[in-house]
Amino acid sequence: MKASELRALDDAQLRAKLSEYKVELFNLRFQKATGKLTNTARPKQVKKDIARILTILRERELAQAELG
């Protein structure tokens, strides 16, 4: 998911996406361990999406602290 798409979401939606991606990453790791992972690039994509979400949430926290 692109960062611009993620920035359009509010905090609650971002946190929901974050939990979805964490569950997906867990399942992908499990598939890799059992040898059933077909798309080997997907775990890297999911990790990057998680990092993007965490970055956006942190940016918003810092902006709020700066304002208030």
Curated annotation (Swiss-Prot):
GO molecular function terms noted in the UniProt entry: structural constituent of ribosome
GO biological process, one term: translation
Lineage: superkingdom: Bacteria
Keyword Ribonucleoprotein applies: yes
InterPro entries, per the entry: Ribosomal_protein_uL29, Ribosomal_uL29, Ribosomal_uL29_sf
One Pfam family cited in the UniProt record for this chain: Ribosomal_L29
Electron transport recorded as keyword: no
Keywords: Ribonucleoprotein, Ribosomal protein
Cellular component terms per the entry's GO annotation: cytosolic large ribosomal subunit
Family: Belongs to the universal ribosomal protein uL29 family.
Name of the molecule in the record: Large ribosomal subunit protein uL29
Organism: Chloroflexus aggregans (strain MD-66 / DSM 9485)
Name of the gene encoding the protein in the UniProt record: rpmC
